[in-house]
Amino acid sequence: KMYTTAAALCLLGPEYRYGTDFVTNGTLDNGILKGDLIIRGSGDPTWSERFYDSNYDSVMVCFVDSLKALGISEINGKIIGDDNVFDDLHWGAGWMWDDEYEWHYAELSGLSFNENYIDYTLIPDSSTIGNPVIIEPLLKTSYINLRNDMVTVGSKAEEDWRYGRNHSTNDCWFEGDYSIQSGVDEADLTIHNPTLFTAHVLKEYLLDAGIKVNGNPVDADDLIDSIDYEQTSILFTYISHPMSRVIAEANQPSSNHIAETLQKTLGNELGEGGTSKEGLKIQMAFYDSLGMDVENLYLRDGSGLSRYNLVSPSNSTSLLQVMWDHDYRDDFVKSFPIAGVIGSIDDRMMGSNAVGSVHAKTGNMTNVSSLSGYAWTKSGEPMIFSIMVNNHMTGNSKVKPLQDKIAIILSDME
């Protein structure tokens, strides 16, 4: 993510914003939109609760309010989602197929809502052992089919539960035994076909707001005839947060979805199309122009999920140095997690001089853990570091304290 966000920030600029057009192929007559409502996806990754104070509703309510402001009370047509700004490869090269239901493996699309997953709250009924666990989706939608075969048990020793989503469907399930001693917990599941999901959820919000919709949600790829945008008119355009905010949301909590979207955006804006392959061409040319050793840098996706990626501490420290000397240094450094303060290291290095002084990006997969960034010494001198631990058998929970000790040593220096 550090590599992708650096390229996106420098090549597109901190004030770059996505613009998504809501258009129609019909006319507006006395409050009735006689035609389809078409969402022409721009690849905007900001339509999620992470950009709106953990509020799922905000962005959809904004869309509904914009249509209401135009006087629309009824749509006599379909809700069409168009994701063709990007290709239809929903995963990065080398991603693990058996993790497709996990939120960090959510499908990629040129039109997405809430990073294409749904959070669920698990609430055990403690009144009677054997009762079903209450499972509440934070986003209530009929787009998914939920099967709940999970019941309560007494002790933690008896607990054994699992959840998932059937391949290439929206059939989600929870099953097993959940201990009442575990209390309230959370889980998340990805959805299939983000474009149709977005159109479906928008229709639900429109209906809830009293706007009648006579047609069904549709993925533009399923239309018999392609959309001729020269024969449409723009109803309104939704403008995203700026790039400076987008990269912060990619780096601090570590969002794979945002990073992958940025890579395809680079391909769409500066290459020959919205694909990861085109985005990578732009990225590698950018690193080469900065004098980095691109012969020994092997990237295959935008987020770092792929096992095909091969980078070294030397690559990473070179990038960190280049960005330190860049005009956009402040935006880049501010996008990083901060030890003991925010992001993926907000609970690490506690009680040490590293708290507030180490700004570093994490990178973790099974048997792989890295920490790269900037550490300020006691005298305020910035230092660049990169720690990578590969092919270990101890688990990342035992590797991270070692990384923390090294970062603390740097921050303790005079």
Residue ranges and their predicted role:
Residues 2, 189-196, 306-310, 396-397:
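Short, conserved micro-motifs enriched in small and acidic residues
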